[in-house]
């Protein structure tokens, strides 16, 4: 986060363009760096399946955070419909939303209904509608990683992030040569 914010605060040509299109682009760079933390500390794996495991990890992380993101969206929709809600009512709504989303998207896989696990994220109240940026950030990350192959990551980051706060697709066009798209079955 600090790398992105430092670059987009000090290296963007126009002050009004400082920043990124959304926090999904901040999260994307954080994900890029998180992947490199253990190798930087000397923990290197030569596992032939590492790339496949990484793809599975990204998929699973996205699947998990998408459920929480839906709880966030449903909860804020409920709050706008109930502006005088009390804290106990809000708590009930969050739990109800979490169970509804769990039952629709997770229970068929896990075989357990009415779980409230998706209600545990405090981000949804602390930082409204921030959570949906995580899955979008994984899509951006995937395309950035493809762009970084065979290149020096730091140089690419310094080339891409000073673009500033453009529309998401224009930013992606400059960064990777195309719009943000989800590619199934490979990068």
Predicted segments with their positions:
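Histidine-centered active-site/metal-ligand motif
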Residues: 1-4, 27, 76, 123
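Short, surface-exposed loop/turn segments at secondary-structure junctions
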Residues: 14-20, 84-88
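Post-HExxH zinc-binding segment in Zn-dependent metallohydrolases
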Residues: 18-58, 137, 165
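C-terminal, non-catalytic "cap/extension" segments appended to globular domains
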Residues: 32, 61, 65, 69-187
